[in-house]
Curated annotation (Swiss-Prot):
Keywords recorded for this protein, A-Z: 4Fe-4S, Cytoplasm, Disulfide bond, Iron, Iron-sulfur, Metal-binding, Methyltransferase, rRNA processing, S-adenosyl-L-methionine, Transferase, tRNA processing
Substrates-to-products reaction catalysed: adenosine(2503) in 23S rRNA + 2 reduced [2Fe-2S]-[ferredoxin] + 2 S-adenosyl-L-methionine = 2-methyladenosine(2503) in 23S rRNA + 5'-deoxyadenosine + L-methionine + 2 oxidized [2Fe-2S]-[ferredoxin] + S-adenosyl-L-homocysteine; adenosine(37) in tRNA + 2 reduced [2Fe-2S]-[ferredoxin] + 2 S-adenosyl-L-methionine = 2-methyladenosine(37) in tRNA + 5'-deoxyadenosine + L-methionine + 2 oxidized [2Fe-2S]-[ferredoxin] + S-adenosyl-L-homocysteine
GO biological process: rRNA base methylation; tRNA methylation
Domain called Radical SAM core: residue spans: 105-338
Name of the coding gene: rlmN
Other facts noted in the record for this chain: Reaction proceeds by a ping-pong mechanism involving intermediate methylation of a conserved cysteine residue.
Function according to Swiss-Prot or TrEMBL: Specifically methylates position 2 of adenine 2503 in 23S rRNA and position 2 of adenine 37 in tRNAs. m2A2503 modification seems to play a crucial role in the proofreading step occurring at the peptidyl transferase center and thus would serve to optimize ribosomal fidelity.
Entries under Pfam families matching the protein: Radical_SAM, RlmN_N
Organism encoding this protein: Campylobacter fetus subsp. fetus (strain 82-40)
Highest taxon, organism lineage: Bacteria
CDD domains assigned: Radical_SAM
Cofactor(s), names only, from the UniProt record: [4Fe-4S] cluster
Subcellular location: Cytoplasm
Protein name per UniProt: Dual-specificity RNA methyltransferase RlmN
Cofactor remark from the record: Binds 1 [4Fe-4S] cluster. The cluster is coordinated with 3 cysteines and an exchangeable S-adenosyl-L-methionine.
Length: 354
């Protein structure tokens, strides 16, 4: 049997007659949250029985969830082959001014999804890397994370949702399936999550950044930089030996980005590793001529890590210097730290307690 979520609407239409059935099914699955074909009451019983014999709708089983004191929720999902992945819901608040001048607070959601079971990149600061690489996720397994989390939390279809490919795995090492997931999520008959609400993060696979740009999906790009010299970056991120900083920056400069948006550079700050003012100065030079936003991330500790969280003073000084030189810079508020759901803390669980 096949995972129906792996199919774009066009692919599904090519398998069905009449073709408009594909739109009906898409709307049932993505807009009406149908979890079985039996719920699709405007489709004949014979067609539903045929669909049940060929497809399944839910490739994920939630093994457990943990809720952080900040409201973040981490989910451990089991796939059909027994492998596991983790995803995170990050609820936030945004203020919207109404016509009468009053300010209303609305929930805004970001869903952090995994693109692989494990990861090949071997970054020394990341817990996901400790378990090695197992396999790529299919497009449907990626889409299912968003669909399941939205459904579980009763997030209205029309509510604003952002998707960040920053969970387990290197998204550009699974570019075919990630790009297909982006397109499925964009479908207006599906979840209708626009490309500008989807951010793909990469450790710096320069050749794949180029391929992603050629696909012209309209997604936002985030670069996990974390160091300003090749020597240090190669120690932190072995991928730098294949694609050094210069190669990554060349790929970024060639990447098509919306005029209203910026390329995000993620910079994980670690105590006495990359947190001094000389690093900040070198970063400003490195980003010269690029419409960039720097996201400073305080290292999130995990068992067995050789790194430590930096002092708030050093982080503030780092940010202040970047801003004084005209670089847009924010300090990411790490959500889910108390449930190991923050950056670099997700991992595959080979033995799951059911």
């Amino acid at each position: 049997m096949r995972n129906l979520l792996d199919l774009s609407q066009d692919e599904l239409a090519n398998l069905l007659s009449p073709k408009f059935r594909a739109k009906q099914i898409y709307e049932w699955v993505y807009k009406k949250n149908a979890r079985s074909f039996d719920e699709m009451t405007n489709i004949s019983k014979d067609v539903r029985e045929n669909l049940k014999s060929e497809f399944y709708l839910d490739p994920l089983t939630c093994v457990r969830s943990e809720t952080s004191k900040d409201g973040s929720i981490k989910y451990l999902f089991k796939l059909t082959d027994g492998k596991t992945i983790e995803s995170v819901l990050l609820p936030m608040k945004e203020e919207i001014s109404s016509e009468d001048g009053s300010v209303e607070r609305h929930a805004r959601y970001t869903i952090c999804v995994s693109s692989q079971v494990g990861c090949k990149m071997g970054c020394s600061f990341c817990l996901t890397a400790k378990g090695g690489f197992v396999r790529n996720l299919s497009a449907g397994e990626i889409v299912a994370q968003i669909l399941w989390i939205k459904r579980e939390n009763n997030i209205p279809y029309e509510r604003r949702v952002n998707v960040v490919y920053m969970g387990m795995g290197e998204p550009l090492d699974n570019l075919t399936n990630v790009s297909k997931a982006v397109s499925i999520l964009k479908d207006n008959d599906g979840l209708a999550i626009g490309a500008r609400r989807q951010t793909i993060s990469t450790s710096g696979l320069a050749s794949q950044i180029k391929k992603l740009g050629e696909l012209d999906l309209g997604v936002l790009l985030a670069i996990s930089l974390h160091a300003v010299t090749d020597e240090l970056r190669a120690k932190l991120m072995p991928i730098n030996k294949a694609y050094n900083i210069a190669a990554v920056m060349d790929a970024v400069r060639a990447f098509p980005i919306d005029m209203r948006k910026r390329v995000m550079f993620e910079y994980l700050i670690m105590d006495k590793v990359n947190d001094n003012l000389s690093d900040a100065k070198a970063l400003v030079k490195l980003l010269h001529g690029i419409k960039a936003k720097v996201n400073l991330i305080l290292f999130n500790p995990h068992e067995g890590s050789q790194y430590q969280r930096p002092s708030i003073e050093n982080v503030d000084n780092f940010r202040t210097y970047l801003q004084s030189r005209g670089v847009t810079c924010t300090i990411r508020q790490s959500k889910g730290l108390d449930i190991s759901a923050a950056c670099g803390q997700l991992k595959e669980r080979s033995k799951v307690e059911m």
